[in-house]
C-alpha cells in the first residue's frame, strides 16, 4: 500500500475511515458512485463481477479500484451480505455545492448478515436473527434480536449444547461474542451453521437501552442484552425505537428438541434438499401473511407444554373449523395485510417510503373486518386475543389524506404528498402547472412573431430553458432578437429575459415544492412512528390469527382430529394415525394408517420388520403428531390421546456428520447420549436401528444395554426399531417392553410389505428381497440365499443377560450363538469376559471401549 505522504487528501480520508472498518467492504461515496479501493476493490470485483480498474494508473503504484452506481448499490450490497460479508456505507454528509475543500464523509451504517433491513435482502417468512453470547464460566448468557421486526429475547443457558441448540433453531447468521467463549463452542457453531462472529467490547450507557432491559433480573441476561443493543447502535447509527422490551424466555418452558432431533424430524428443513418443501412446516403453512409464516415457524420450534395454553389454541382452531364461510372471509382479509412487523421497523429505522405507507394503510384497513369476523365466532375463546385486535383509524386517516396512491419509491423527487394536504404545496404545484402553460403560450407567441413554425422551447439541467431554432430557419430570425446561448450541429439555442423570468418562477416553485414535500413526508413518518407500539401489538395479534386459521384449513383439508392431551397421564393411544407429510406427498394414493398404543405400564415398543417396510416412517409419524398436538394443531388420526411430552430425542437415519469428521456410529452414540443423559419419564425417545454403525456383536450389546437402561433408569416412552431380532426375547424379562413388527407376506416367491404394524416380533428380515427390489444381479441374490440357508441351519440363540432386580439370575447354561464349528481358547476367554460384564453399570462409551479391547483379542 502506498505511503500516506503520497496520498491525496481524499485518499487520506478514505484510509482513515477504512482503518475503522477493517472487516468490512467500504462503499465510499464519490458523486453518483460508491467506490472501493485496494483489497476491497480486488475482492469485490471478483465476487460482484465488476471491472477492476486503477486510480493513478500511470503511477508506479496505481491503486486498484472499482465502483457501482449509488442507485443500483443495494443489489450489490445484498450479494455481499448473502455471502457472509459486512458492508460499511460511507456517505457525503456535506453538500459539495456549498463546501469548500474536502467534502466530509462518514459511515452512516454498517450492514452485516444479522442486521439486514432491506426487504429484498430478507426472506418474507423467515426471521433474520442476530444473536449474542457470553459466559461467566458456569452458565451462558444468550440473547437474540430481529432488527427488521424488533423482537428481542434473552435467556440463561446451562451449557455449550444449549447454545448450539438455540443458535441452530434460530438459524443465526451472525453472533456477537462476549467474554470467555470457549474455542470448542466457536468451532461447533462454525461447523453447524453458516455463521460469522462479531465482537462488542463495551456496553453503552443509554437511557433507551436501560428501558428495554429494566424488567430483566439476571446479571448475565442484562449484560448480554446490553452488548447486543450496543452492537446494533454502533453498526446502525440511528434510532432503534422499534426494538421491543427484552423478554426473558426459558427453553424448559417449551417442548425441547435438540439440533439432531429437529434435523431428523425435518420440521422446517428437508434432510435431502435443505429446503422447506417436504417438511412439517411446508405442510402446515397456509398462512396468508409473511409475519404469520414467521410465527408458525417459531411455534414449531417451541411447542407448548402447558395444558391450558394448548387447549386455548385448540379452542380457537375448533371455532374456525366450525365457521367455514367466516374463515374464507378472514383469509381474504388477511391476504390484503402486508408485513406490518417489518413496515413498523422501517418506519422507526427511517427507511420507509411512500409505497410502504400505502401498504401500511391497506393493511390497517383490514383490521375492522378481521375483528368483526372474530367477534362473530367468539364464544369466549378469543377474548384475550381480541383485547389487542383494535383498529388504528387515526393512522389510516392520516395516510389516506397525506400520501399519494401512486407514490414513487424515492421520497426526495416529489409526487409523494397528495394535492389538498398542504396549502403552500398546492400553491407551488399551481405555479408549476401554470408555468408549463406559460411556456406553451410563449412558444406559440414566438412562433407567431418569427414565422418559424418549428421553433420550440426546451430544457436541460445545464442551460435551463431555451429557444431552439434549426439552422435552416436562422435566416428568418431578426438579428438581435434573442441572446445566443449554444450552438449545435443543426440548430442554435437562445434565451430571452422573459424566458429567464419564467424559468426562475418555475424552477423556484419546483425546488421549493420538492423540499416542502420531503419535509411533509418526514412529518407524516414521525406521526406514524409514535404509533410503533400499537402497530407491533397489532402485528403479533394478526399473526396469531393467521397461524390459527392455517391450522383450521389444514385440519379440514386432511380430516385431522382434535387430540386429547393431559399432563397427568402416561397413556398414549393414537388410532389409525398417519404421517402428515407422507400423506400429502402421496396425494390421491391410499395411505395405510397405523395405530400406536402404549398404556401407562408400557414404556418401550421394540419394532422389528423388513427394511423399507415403514419402521422409520412410523416413528417419525408419532413425533410429528406430538409436535402438531403441542403447538395447538389437530392431528392426522381417527382419535388421539396422549401425554404432554417435555422433550423429544431422536436417532433416525444414517446422517453421517462427515464435515465434522464423525462417523455414523459416533453420531449414533452422541445422539443416544443426549437422550440417556437428559430424558425424563415425560420424554419421548425414538431410536431407529441403533448400533448398526459398528460390528454386529458390538451393536447388539450396546442396543440391549441401552434398552435396559431406558427401561430401568429413564422410563420414557420409547420406540426402538432394530434389525437385531435376537433382542425380541427381552419382553420376557422387561415388563415395560412390548414387541411389534411391520407385517409382510410371501406370495409366489415374492414379498409384499403390508406397511401395517402388528403385535409380536417379526419372524424374518427379508433383506434379500429388498436387495432384489433394489435390482441386484440374480446370481448374486441366489448366492446370498444359499449362504443365508447355511447360516440359519447353524444358528442358535444369543445370550440375553438382563441385570435387573425383578429378573432372576440367568443360568450359566444359556445357549450362545456360534458362527464357527470350533471355538478357540482365546475366543472362549473373550466370551467368559463378556458374560461377567455388568453392562447396566457401564456407560455406552465404556461398553464400546471394552468391546473394542475384546475385539482385538479375537
Swiss-Prot record:
The keyword Nucleotide-binding belongs to this UniProt entry's keyword annotation: yes
Record carries keyword Nucleotide-binding: yes
InterPro entries documented for this protein: DNA_mismatch_repair_MutS, DNA_mismatch_repair_MutS-lik_N, DNA_mismatch_repair_MutS/MSH, DNA_mismatch_repair_MutS_C, DNA_mismatch_repair_MutS_clamp, DNA_mismatch_repair_MutS_core, DNA_mismatch_repair_MutS_N, DNA_mismatch_repair_MutS_sf
Superkingdom of origin: Bacteria
Keywords for this protein: ATP-binding, DNA damage, DNA repair, DNA-binding, Nucleotide-binding
Name of one Pfam family that matches: MutS_III
Signal peptide: none
SUPFAM superfamilies with a match to the protein in the record: DNA repair protein MutS, domain I, DNA repair protein MutS, domain II, DNA repair protein MutS, domain III, P-loop containing nucleoside triphosphate hydrolases
GO MF term list: ATP binding; ATP-dependent DNA damage sensor activity; damaged DNA binding; mismatched DNA binding
GO cellular component term of the entry, any: cytosol
Record-linked SMART domains: MUTSac, MUTSd
GO terms, biological process: mismatch repair
Binding site for ATP: 609-616
Gene3D superfamilies in the cross-refs: 1.10.1420.10, DNA repair protein MutS, domain I, MutS, connector domain, P-loop containing nucleotide triphosphate hydrolases
Chain's role: This protein is involved in the repair of mismatches in DNA. It is possible that it carries out the mismatch recognition step. This protein has a weak ATPase activity.
Family: Belongs to the DNA mismatch repair MutS family.
HAMAP family, per database record: MutS (MF_00096)
Entry protein name: DNA mismatch repair protein MutS
UniProt source species: Enterococcus faecalis (strain ATCC 700802 / V583)
High-level lineage: Bacteria, Bacillati, Bacillota, Bacilli, Lactobacillales
Amino acid at each position: 500500500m502506498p505511503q500516506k505522504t503520497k496520498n491525496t487528501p481524499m485518499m487520506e480520508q478514505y484510509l482513515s475511515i477504512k482503518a475503522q472498518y477493517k472487516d468490512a467492504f467500504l462503499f465510499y461515496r464519490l458523486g453518483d458512485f460508491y467506490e472501493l479501493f485496494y483489497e476491497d476493490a480486488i475482492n469485490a470485483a471478483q465476487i460482484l463481477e465488476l471491472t477492476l480498474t486503477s486510480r493513478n494508473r500511470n503511477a508506479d503504484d496505481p491503486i486498484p479500484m472499482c465502483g457501482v452506481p449509488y442507485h443500483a448499490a443495494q443489489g450489490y450490497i445484498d450479494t455481499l451480505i448473502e455471502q457472509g460479508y459486512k458492508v460499511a456505507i460511507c456517505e457525503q454528509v456535506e453538500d459539495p455545492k456549498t463546501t469548500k475543500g474536502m467534502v466530509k464523509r462518514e459511515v452512516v451504517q454498517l450492514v452485516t448478515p444479522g442486521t439486514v433491513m432491506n426487504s429484498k435482502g430478507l426472506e418474507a417468512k423467515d426471521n433474520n436473527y442476530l444473536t449474542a453470547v457470553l459466559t461467566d464460566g458456569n452458565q451462558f448468557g444468550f440473547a437474540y434480536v430481529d432488527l427488521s421486526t424488533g423482537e428481542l429475547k434473552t435467556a440463561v443457558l446451562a451449557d455449550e449444547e444449549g447454545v448450539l441448540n438455540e443458535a441452530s433453531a434460530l438459524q443465526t447468521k451472525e453472533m456477537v461474542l462476549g467474554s470467555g467463549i470457549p474455542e470448542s463452542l466457536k468451532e461447533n457453531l462454525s461447523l453447524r451453521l453458516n455463521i460469522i462472529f462479531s465482537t462488542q467490547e463495551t456496553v453503552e450507557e443509554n437511557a433507551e437501552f436501560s428501558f428495554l432491559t429494566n424488567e430483566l433480573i439476571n446479571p448475565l441476561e442484562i449484560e448480554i442484552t446490553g452488548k447486543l443493543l450496543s452492537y446494533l447502535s454502533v453498526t446502525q447509527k440511528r434510532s432503534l425505537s422499534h426494538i421491543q422490551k427484552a423478554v426473558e424466555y426459558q427453553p424448559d418452558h417449551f417442548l425441547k428438541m435438540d439440533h439432531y432431533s429437529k434435523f431428523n424430524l425435518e420440521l422446517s428443513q428437508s434432510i435431502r434438499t435443505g429446503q422447506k418443501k417436504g417438511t412439517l412446516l411446508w405442510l402446515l403453512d397456509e398462512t396468508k401473511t409473511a409475519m404469520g409464516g414467521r410465527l408458525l415457524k417459531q411455534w414449531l420450534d417451541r411447542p407448548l407444554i402447558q395444558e391450558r395454553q394448548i387447549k386455548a389454541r385448540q379452542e380457537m382452531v375448533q371455532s374456525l373449523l366450525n365457521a367455514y364461510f367466516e374463515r374464507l372471509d378472514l383469509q381474504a382479509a388477511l391476504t390484503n395485510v402486508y408485513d406490518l412487523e417489518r413496515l413498523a421497523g422501517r418506519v422507526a429505522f427511517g427507511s420507509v417510503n411512500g409505497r410502504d405507507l400505502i401498504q401500511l394503510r391497506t393493511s390497517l384497513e383490514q383490521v375492522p373486518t378481521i375483528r368483526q369476523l372474530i367477534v362473530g365466532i367468539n364464544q369466549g375463546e378469543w377474548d384475550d386475543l381480541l383485547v389487542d385486535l383494535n383498529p388504528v383509524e387515526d393512522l389510516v386517516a392520516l395516510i389516506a389524506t397525506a400520501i399519494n396512491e401512486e407514490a414513487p419509491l424515492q421520497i426526495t423527487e416529489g409526487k409523494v404528498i397528495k394535492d389538498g394536504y398542504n396549502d403552500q404545496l398546492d400553491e407551488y404545484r399551481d405555479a408549476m402547472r401554470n408555468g408549463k402553460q406559460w411556456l406553451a403560450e410563449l412558444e406559440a407567441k414566438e412562433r407567431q412573431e418569427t414565422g418559424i413554425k418549428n421553433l420550440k422551447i426546451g430544457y436541460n439541467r445545464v442551460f435551463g430553458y431555451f429557444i431552439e431554432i434549426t439552422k435552416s430557419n436562422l435566416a428568418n430570425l431578426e438579428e438581435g432578437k434573442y441572446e445566443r446561448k449554444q450552438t449545435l450541429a443543426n440548430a442554435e439555442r437562445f434565451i430571452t429575459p422573459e424566458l429567464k423570468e419564467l424559468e426562475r418562477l418555475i424552477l423556484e416553485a419546483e425546488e421549493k415544492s420538492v423540499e416542502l414535500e420531503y419535509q411533509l413526508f418526514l412529518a407524516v413518518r414521525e406521526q406514524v412512528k409514535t404509533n410503533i407500539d400499537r402497530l407491533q401489538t397489532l402485528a403479533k395479534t394478526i399473526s396469531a390469527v393467521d397461524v390459527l386459521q392455517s391450522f383450521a384449513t389444514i385440519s379440514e383439508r386432511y380430516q385431522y382430529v382434535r387430540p386429547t392431551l393431559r399432563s397427568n397421564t402416561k397413556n398414549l393411544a393414537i388410532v389409525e394415525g398417519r404421517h402428515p407429510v407422507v400423506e400429502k406427498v402421496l396425494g390421491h394414493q391410499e395411505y395405510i394408517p397405523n395405530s400406536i398404543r402404549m398404556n401407562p405400564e408400557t414404556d418401550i415398543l421394540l419394532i422389528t420388520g423388513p427394511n423399507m417396510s415403514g419402521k422409520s416412517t412410523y416413528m417419525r409419524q408419532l413425533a410429528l403428531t406430538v409436535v402438531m398436538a403441542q403447538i395447538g394443531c389437530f392431528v392426522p388420526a381417527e382419535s388421539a390421546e396422549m401425554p404432554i411430552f417435555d422433550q423429544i430425542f431422536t436417532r433416525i437415519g444414517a446422517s453421517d456428520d462427515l464435515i465434522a469428521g464423525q462417523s455414523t456410529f459416533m453420531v449414533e452414540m452422541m445422539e443416544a447420549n443426549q437422550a440417556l443423559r437428559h430424558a425424563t419419564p415425560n420424554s419421548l425417545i425414538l431410536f431407529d436401528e441403533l448400533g448398526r454403525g459398528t460390528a454386529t456383536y458390538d451393536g447388539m450389546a450396546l442396543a440391549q444395554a441401552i434398552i435396559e437402561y431406558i427401561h430401568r433408569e429413564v422410563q420414557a416412552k420409547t420406540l426402538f426399531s432394530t434389525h437385531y431380532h435376537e433382542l425380541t426375547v427381552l419382553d420376557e424379562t422387561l415388563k415395560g417392553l412390548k414387541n411389534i413388527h411391520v407385517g409382510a407376506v410371501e406370495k409366489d416367491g415374492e414379498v409384499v410389505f403390508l406397511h401395517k404394524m402388528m403385535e409380536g416380533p417379526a419372524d424374518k428380515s427379508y433383506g434379500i428381497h429388498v436387495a432384489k427390489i433394489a435390482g441386484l444381479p440374480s446370481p448374486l441374490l441366489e448366492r446370498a440365499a444359499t449362504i443365508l440357508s447355511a447360516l440359519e441351519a447353524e444358528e442358535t440363540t444369543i445370550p440375553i443377560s438382563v441385570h435387573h432386580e425383578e429378573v432372576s439370575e440367568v443360568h450359566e447354561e444359556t445357549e450362545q450363538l456360534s458362527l464357527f464349528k470350533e471355538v478357540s481358547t482365546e475366543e472362549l476367554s473373550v466370551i467368559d469376559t463378556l458374560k461377567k460384564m455388568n453392562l447396566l453399570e457401564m456407560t455406552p462409551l465404556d461398553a464400546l471401549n471394552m468391546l473394542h479391547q475384546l475385539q482385538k483379542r479375537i
